[in-house]
Amino acid sequence: MNCGHRALYGRSVSGSHTIKDNDQVTIEFASSYRRYTTCIMRTVLVGSASSVQRNMFNVVSDAIVAMTDAAGPDTPLGNIDDAHRRVFDEAGHKVHRYSACGYSLGATFRPSWMDVPPMIYSGNPLLCEPGMVFFLHAMLANTDAGYAMSFGHTLVITDNGREVLSGLPIELASNS
């Protein structure tokens, strides 16, 4: 969990920080069952969302939908990141996006939610196959405005497409 300006870092940073009014909090939860891992990521806003944050949320939402739609059997992993890049770049966020948008999850011990390779990056030729599990994350770090917005979920590739393993809706979590 990162909050305030540290939400821009994308991944957890150690140390304490008091959550303040109008902070942004990036939360990543993971859970393991019989050594299989799943995770979700959300940015939660304490207070009201600014117009910049609402725009970033809309772009991140569009990106995660496009990325999810791009995942399927016999599809190169790179196609998922191409969808990620297309949405962010067309919305003017090329400089605010990360260079990869997810990774595989597997049955590991000690439980870990990052089973690499493979990372999901543009040009990755590895084909998705039924039974493969991936964590997709759409993350923006707008250092100019001081805002972050992240959304991530776990999916499994099926014979006919994909199944998202979280039932949580894609919505902006804020007090507004």
Please annotate each region the language model reported:
Residues 1-176:
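Active-site neighborhoods and metal-handling regions in enzymes and metal-associated proteins
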